[in-house]
Amino acid sequence: MRSVTLEEMMEAGVHFGHQTRGWNPKMAPYIYGERNGIHLIDLIQTARLLSEASDFVLNAAKEGKEFLFIGTKNQAADIISSEALRCRSHFVNQRWLGGMLTNWPTIKTRIKRLKDLEQSEKNGTLDNLPKKESAVLKRQLDKLRKYLGGLQDMKTLPDVVIIVDQKREMNAVRECIKLGIPIIALLDTNCDPSLSDLPIPANDDAIRSVNLIISKLADAIYEGQGIK
């Protein structure tokens, strides 16, 4: 597995943090300076921690562990779904519904409902219903697909969760901590690294930055899955 280079990270803008006035002092070890009121992330640290996280997920994938990618902000949503699917993992990229992990039995029943409706759509049952009833069920199907589509193949709680934008996904973070699920988080300078088992300091607003980090983790998972 090829390591990410400093040049790649510079080109992707991984080093650009948030405005200095909004920083979290706990991120100080991962910041090397500031420019024009913006904190600059220490890419040497990013490379080291990304390598550690990649080794962790590679070994977990070798053991058949399950991964859940979470990222609901616009810049991350498409990346989260495409990279999770590429490495045969699960994802949430629209909105985190309270209890997705801590109330997993209820979520499982909603996923079953989604699968049942998809089967009814596939075999034409929905189209044969009265128009009003069909419309209601199709709207329900669209909503379930939007929020739970990335969890359809998740049979049990994930072994590892990968998060983009800790502050936005704090509800998911709290659920993972409560359940003892390891968290790998892409952390900008306004985040709290103590809430992640494997923090990766990086710009969580730029699409290229998010894509670079998440794709490297997906590469490692994919590689690990191929080693049986």
From Swiss-Prot:
Keywords: Chloroplast, Plastid, Ribonucleoprotein, Ribosomal protein. Its main location: plastid. Gene3D superfamilies: Glucose-6-phosphate isomerase like protein, domain 1, Helix hairpin bin. One of its GO terms (biological process) is translation. GO terms for molecular function: structural constituent of ribosome. One of its GO terms (cellular component) is mitochondrial small ribosomal subunit. It holds the Pfam family Ribosomal_S2. It is found in: Plastid, Chloroplast. Belongs to the universal ribosomal protein uS2 family. This is Small ribosomal subunit protein uS2c. It comes from Chlorokybus atmophyticus. The gene is rps2.
